[in-house]
């Protein structure tokens, strides 16, 4: 009896070592390591923890053998009980466990698990076939997922791709990370016997609850049905599409890049110079003096400007800031004067009201050049010459006469003091035209 008990105890330890020490894929050729070593250790640890002592697998083996062999009735009681049960004549086991390598138990029931875990040769082959079918289904689902991703917008495809790792990573990492400890201990076979990852965040049959899967799978599950919505702002704020750019008008449109009045507000120095020249020519052609323009600006627009200010504007002698402020007002005045040329307007009335002396005559540049050339020939023309010259230049006779008078006074101012210019007597016709204060004064006796 002692020998039989010791043999049975050795049978227990050796059979347990055969079951648990055999490497994956050693029971069946071509299995290709259908389980990972980490999964086996975790499953065995779950079985040990659920049954409460380290010989739980061995006890389950004895239970199966006692029913299958028909030898001893009390074989499943423990170490000593196993020895007592093995004393029958009909025991199918020999003293050496290696004597009958073909006899293996078919079913081992995990008492702490949800269902039965198969460890027989046929069961292992069946599990291998199931896993191959699951892998094929996963490949088909991945192909469908890729087709769906090709139909999505680019930002949704990128969003979904960041949260879909490979099936192997989810089988080993996601299930171990998201299952609670009690669930992992009681359901040891669940970690590797059932898949924990499918496309679009759906779990396999009998898998973990839907609330335990990764938040990235929830986002990916929602995206196919709501592809037209933006990604979740809390999970992926950087995936939101950028705001659309502001609309731009045609290239030549002033409102496309800047304010429509920016050219008038900040003109360049070249623009100011060209406008001042154009303004002076238009003012002279319309027959308005600088004082008339300043008075008209004060009456029409509320800004009174003197004749000196208008003169300095035309001569570009104001500061750049003041030139920029005065330019739009003068431009408006020019537009109104051009539109009302040829008929008496409010500008003419305003100029007449403010005019206390004879209107200052403005002479164009071309007319002034003709008068200047005639002055060089004859500084003091006769009345007949003045009349003919006024008719040829379409000017009044009084205007021509006053111009020659003013020109002679200008020539005298240009004469250096204490002497006369060379040929001055020839120009002015002797000393009879010389003013009295230019004569030789005798000292007082």
Curated annotation (Swiss-Prot):
Pfam families registered for this protein in UniProt? Homeodomain (PF00046), Pou (PF00157)
Question: Where along the chain is composition biased (Basic residues)?
Answer: 227-237
Q: Which residues bind DNA?
A: 356-415
What are the record's GO terms for cellular component? Answer: nucleoplasm; nucleus; transcription regulator complex
* Cellular localisation: Nucleus
Q: Which residues form a coiled coil?
A: none
Q: Where is the composition biased (Gly residues)?
A: 67-90
Task: State if Nucleotide-binding is listed as a keyword.
Answer: no
Question: Where is there biased composition of kind Pro residues?
Answer: 239-253
Endpoints of the signal sequence: none
- Provide the GO biological process annotations: central nervous system neuron differentiation; cerebral cortex radially oriented cell migration; epidermis development; forebrain astrocyte development; forebrain ventricular zone progenitor cell division; hypothalamus cell differentiation; myelination in peripheral nervous system; negative regulation of gene expression
Gene Ontology terms, MF aspect: DNA binding; DNA-binding transcription activator activity, RNA polymerase II-specific; DNA-binding transcription factor activity; identical protein binding; RNA polymerase II cis-regulatory region sequence-specific DNA binding; sequence-specific DNA binding
Q: Which residues form the POU-specific domain?
A: 264-338
Q: Which UniProt keywords apply?
A: Activator, Differentiation, DNA-binding, Homeobox, Neurogenesis, Nucleus, Phosphoprotein, Transcription, Transcription regulation
Q: Where is the composition biased (Basic and acidic residues)?
A: 217-226
Q: Which residues carry this modification: Phosphoserine?
A: 343
Q: What does this protein do?
A: Transcription factor that plays a key role in neuronal differentiation. Binds preferentially to the recognition sequence which consists of two distinct half-sites, ('GCAT') and ('TAAT'), separated by a non-conserved spacer region of 0, 2, or 3 nucleotides. Acts as a transcriptional activator when binding cooperatively with SOX4, SOX11, or SOX12 to gene promoters. The combination of three transcription factors, ASCL1, POU3F2/BRN2 and MYT1L, is sufficient to reprogram fibroblasts and other somatic cells into induced neuronal (iN) cells in vitro.
Protein family membership: Belongs to the POU transcription factor family. Class-3 subfamily.
Which protein are we looking at?
Answer: POU domain, class 3, transcription factor 2
Please tell me the species this chain comes from: Mus musculus (Mouse)
Lineage of origin = Eukaryota, Metazoa, Chordata, Craniata, Vertebrata
Q: Which gene encodes it?
A: Pou3f2
């Amino acid at each position: 009896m002692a020998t039989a008990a010791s043999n049975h105890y050795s049978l227990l330890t050796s059979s347990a070592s055969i079951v648990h020490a055999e490497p994956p894929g050693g029971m069946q050729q071509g299995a290709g390591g259908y389980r990972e070593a980490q999964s086996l250790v975790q499953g065995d640890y779950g079985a040990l923890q659920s049954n409460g002592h380290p010989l739980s697998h061995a006890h389950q083996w004895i239970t199966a053998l006692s029913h299958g062999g028909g030898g001893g009735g009390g074989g499943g009681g423990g170490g000593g009980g196993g020895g007592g049960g093995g004393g029958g004549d009909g025991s199918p086991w020999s003293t050496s466990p290696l004597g009958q390598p073909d006899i293996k138990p078919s079913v081992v029931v995990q008492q702490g698990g949800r269902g039965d875990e198969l460890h027989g040769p046929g069961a292992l082959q069946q599990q291998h076939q199931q896993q191959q079918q699951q892998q094929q289904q996963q490949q088909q689902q991945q192909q469908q997922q890729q087709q769906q991703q090709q139909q999505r917008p680019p930002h949704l495809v990128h969003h979904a791709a960041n949260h879909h790792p490979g099936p192997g990573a989810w089988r080993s990492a996601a299930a171990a990370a998201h299952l609670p400890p009690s669930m992992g201990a009681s359901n040891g076979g669940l970690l590797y016997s059932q898949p924990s990852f499918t496309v679009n965040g759906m779990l396999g049959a009998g898998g973990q609850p839907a609330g335990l899967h990764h938040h990235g799978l929830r986002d990916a599950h929602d995206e196919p049905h709501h592809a037209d919505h933006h990604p979740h702002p809390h999970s992926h704020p950087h995936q939101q599409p950028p705001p659309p750019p502001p609309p731009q008008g045609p290239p030549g449109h002033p409102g496309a890049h800047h304010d429509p009045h920016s050219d008038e507000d900040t003109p360049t120095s070249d623009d100011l110079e060209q406008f001042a020249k154009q303004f002076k020519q238009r003012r002279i052609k319309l027959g308005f003096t600088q004082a008339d323009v300043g008075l008209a600006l004060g009456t029409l627009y509320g800004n009174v400007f003197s004749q000196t200010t208008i003169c300095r504007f035309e001569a570009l002698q104001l500061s750049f800031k003041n030139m920029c402020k005065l330019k739009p007002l003068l431009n408006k005045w020019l537009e109104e004067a051009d539109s009302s040329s040829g008929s008496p307007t409010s500008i003419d009335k305003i100029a007449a009201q403010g005019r206390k002396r004879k209107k200052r005559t403005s002479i164009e540049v071309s007319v002034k050049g003709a008068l200047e050339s005639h002055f060089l020939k004859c500084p003091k023309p006769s009345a007949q010459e003045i009349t003919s010259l006024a008719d040829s230049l379409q000017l009044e006779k009084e205007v021509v006469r006053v111009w020659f008078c003013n020109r002679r006074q200008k020539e005298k101012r240009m004469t250096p003091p204490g002497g006369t210019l060379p040929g001055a007597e020839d120009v002015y016709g002797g000393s009879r035209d010389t003013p009295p204060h230019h004569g030789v004064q005798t000292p007082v006796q």
